[in-house]
Amino acid sequence: MHTHELFKTPLEEDEVEVSEDDVVGFIAEIEQEVVNESDSEIGEYDLGDDIGAPEPFERAAANAEDSISSDGSFNPNDEDSDTDSDDSMLDEPDEAAVGGASKAKRRKDDDGPSGSSNRNQDSDGNAFDMDEDDETDETVRAIIAAIKKPRSAPPEIKLEDFITDICFHPERHIIALATIIGDVHLYEYSNEENKLLKTIEVHAKACRDVEFTEDGRSLITCSKDKSVMITDMETEKLKKLYETAHDDAINKLLVLDERLFASGDDSGTVKLWDFRTKDSIFELKEIEDQVTQMITNDQKKLLLATSADGYLTTFNIGARKLYVQSEPYEEELNCMGIYRGNSKLVVGTSKGRLYSYNWGYFGYHCDMYPGIKSPISLMIPITERIACVAGEDGNIRACHITPYRNLGVVGQHNMPIESMDINTNGELLASSSHNNDVRFWNVKYFEDFGDIKYNEKHNAYKDKRHNLPSSKCTNASDFFADLAKEDNNDNENDDATAGPSNTT
């Protein structure tokens, strides 16, 4: 606004005979009321109460209106009023205060002549705010309920060092974590927390595999330093050391029973050991590359080994000789599992395929499944028909064996998965990744999973990406299903609360 507009000369028709004392008194009342109102707003941060002017201010404004506006010539909102000009010239520092009072007056005028309208609007506004607060509270309560929901699996374990292998104790709630610096960490796990029991320094170089003996009293570890160690879990004392167990770095261990265990190294040598002897009781070199996994069935007559050179090699434990070696595959054979009552062997490969063999006939596969189309490095049998496979993509997927079917995602890691194991009762799956973390997945729900029929229709694309109950992610279909369920519940509630129709 220009200066000449602020200080223009009042017109004769705008002049009002008001004494200076009345003007000063009126301004003082407004200033005091605005100060009180500002203090109230600053102290309580309650903007809802500021919609209507306080009662003392209403009385002051009403008195001023009766005394000054009785002749009808005085309008506080008129910019051309000489009183406004005089007020601005008399007390410029209080312009903000007068402006605040004018806004409060305008709010009062908009509310109507009666204060009841203002109070009704306050009530409506408060009710609206309460409705919004109720919705917010429901959302917050839902989030809190999800956070406080009882855990079905232990929390994550995070280490500073790379985790090379994990193994569950056969009887107790203890898990062993082998690390790249040669240590083994023993954790007691529960759904509430994980507790570090002890750290055992076993090897000078990377500890590549860790296994518990059948009674759970000792740990068997192998290392890049070519040694095998047997350590008492409770006392941490070394019970036996095979300092040069292999000529090359040892990669895999397998406990056969209370007396025997097997080891395989990076050059393909497989050895059989007896806890009671100093040297190996059997050694065979039929593989030219790293032994990736070893397995046996309940009868423990045959020892099977997969290798990075694409062979499945079977040894006769009793006869201590080669049983059969498969035809070579143009891909790495990384992992395997036994299913269907020890009648089927399934092998996972670096190309994401799954080869199925009839037990005892390991020369060539009888079935080939497309798998997950990404390298499969780990496999854990969950039931007689269901396997969990994992690899470089960081996902743990469940597969149904014979007929083959992708069931969905069991769990996820942010980086490639390095090792997996399942506890004795088959309900808890653990996995470690290149992110130095161990995560747990409750897979008990597979016990109630029915058999799949060969001709059953399914969507392979959706099945592969479907998130199972143990997954940390949810399915979009579940989200929209919940929304539809909420809408149906709301409609039912509306129908229940609706009164009888008044139409005739």
From Swiss-Prot:
It comes from the Eukaryota. Belongs to the WD repeat WDR55 family. It holds the Pfam family WDR55. Signal peptide: none annotated. Residues 66-76, 114-124 have a biased composition (Polar residues). It comes from Drosophila willistoni. Keywords: Repeat, WD repeat. WD repeats lie at residues 158-197, 202-241, 245-283, 286-325, 328-367, 412-451. This is WD repeat-containing protein 55 homolog. Residues 32-135, 484-504 are annotated as: Disordered.
